[in-house]
């Protein structure tokens, strides 16, 4: 099988393929390293990041339904300073684009 060019350009951002993670459930990807090679993704879309740390919603945050589950975490995040100091250096070690979900 020959190599197929799967590169895409989205609003001027060149990605090697259109595969990206869903914001929220993937965090910044640390927990998924043993399951997913981040180098193979077109981009990592990180969990929402706010200027200040945000504790999110009170429990319960998850409700099971017949067809799956619903969640309402409430954009819990450690804030921009933590993200810049910890998550950006982690993500930069991979050959993939970083899409930051800015909330607040």
Which residues make up each language-model segment?
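N-terminal capping/small domains of soluble enzymes
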Residues: 1-97, 103
């Amino acid at each position: 099988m020959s190599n197929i060019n799967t590169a895409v350009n989205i609003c001027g951002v060149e990605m090697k393929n259109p595969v990206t993670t869903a914001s929220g459930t993937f965090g910044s990807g640390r927990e998924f390293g043993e399951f997913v090679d981040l180098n193979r993704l077109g981009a990592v879309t990180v969990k929402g990041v706010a200027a200040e740390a945000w504790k999110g919603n009170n429990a319960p945050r998850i409700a099971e339904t017949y067809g799956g589950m619903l969640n309402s975490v409430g954009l819990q995040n450690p804030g921009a300073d933590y993200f810049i100091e910890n998550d950006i250096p982690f993500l930069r070690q991979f050959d993939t684009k970083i899409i930051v979900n800015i909330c607040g």
